[in-house]
């Protein structure tokens, strides 16, 4: 039987899917938004708790683990030379508003999982971990080790990975299960500009925008935004809002 056929047969067992869903829920249920640093918890208690839970899961599945001062954790497939790094992360961006379910209590509805981190990146981390388990369980021949690296600061700049690679060498190969399948190339860099201006004093013409705010953080598309506009009547503002909505969808 070819390796692909072996893997497909392995995952055809409904128990595998239940194991996958249960492991994802276990991590999603830990609120791992970055917080103030504490001793032994460089990114606050949330990411540290998620890392503890993930490493416990790895050990329960029979993998050897390491903890780099709660910046990152590791799970190794075997004891051979490491030639593949799988880069995942356990931290999440704040949940924002508009949820119809508890973002930190993973639920399944109509075959879809809902919870903070299901797709970015706790779900993919668990998929990678159980893929490693499948390779091991099936006894597929490998000439090198695959190492799962569990980060805790990806959403705020990846200082966790920088900490790890300041102490350990890069692998010849690496990928991150943090996007769509198949392999894609995204996020070559980030640009976070700040804009400011000064105007000479002038009569305050109306209508004018007095304030504008929106969004949770720099790396998240704002779910909503607000503007304070002075000197405009409500019917006129409603008309403008409808026109913008029709134009932008």
PLM region spans:
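N-terminal helical capping/dimerization or prosegment-like subdomains
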Residues: 2-87, 93-95
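Short, surface-exposed alpha-helical segments at coil->helix boundaries
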Residues: 48-52, 125, 238
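Short helix-capping segments at alpha-helix termini
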Residues: 61, 138-141, 248-249
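Fold-independent oxyanion-binding glycine-rich loops
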Residues: 70-71, 88-90, 110, 118, ...
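Short coil/turn connectors at secondary-structure junctions
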Residues: 80-85, 109-110, 142-146, 169-173, ...
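Active-site metal-coordination/substrate-binding segment of hydrolases
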Residues: 83-150, 156
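Midchain, well-structured core segments that form catalytic/ion-binding scaffolds
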Residues: 155, 161-249
């Amino acid at each position: 039987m070819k390796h692909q056929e072996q893997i497909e047969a392995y995952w055809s067992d409904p128990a595998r899917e239940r194991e996958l869903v249960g492991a994802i829920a276990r991590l999603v249920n830990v609120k791992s938004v970055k917080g103030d640093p504490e001793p032994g918890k460089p990114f606050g208690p949330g990411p540290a708790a998620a890392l503890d839970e993930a490493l416990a899961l790895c050990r329960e599945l029979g993998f050897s683990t390491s903890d780099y001062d709660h910046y990152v954790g590791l799970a190794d497939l075997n004891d051979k030379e490491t030639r593949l790094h799988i880069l995942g992360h356990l931290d999440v961006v704040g949940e924002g508003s508009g949820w119809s379910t508890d973002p930190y209590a993973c639920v399944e509805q109509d075959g879809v999982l809902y919870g903070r981190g299901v797709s970015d990146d706790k779900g993919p981390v668990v998929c990678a971990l159980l893929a490693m388990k499948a390779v091991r369980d099936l006894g597929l021949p490998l000439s090198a080790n695959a190492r799962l690296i569990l980060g805790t600061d990806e959403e705020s700049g990846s200082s966790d990975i920088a900490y790890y690679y300041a102490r350990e060498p890069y692998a010849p190969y690496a990928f991150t299960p943090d996007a769509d399948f198949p392999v894609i190339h995204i996020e070559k860099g980030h640009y976070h500009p700040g804009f400011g201006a000064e105007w000479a004093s002038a009569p305050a013409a109306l209508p004018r925008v007095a304030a504008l705010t929106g969004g949770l953080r720099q790396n998240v598309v704002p779910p909503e935004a607000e503007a304070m506009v002075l000197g405009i009547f409500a019917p006129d503002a409603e008309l403008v809002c409808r026109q913008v909505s029709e134009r932008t969808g």
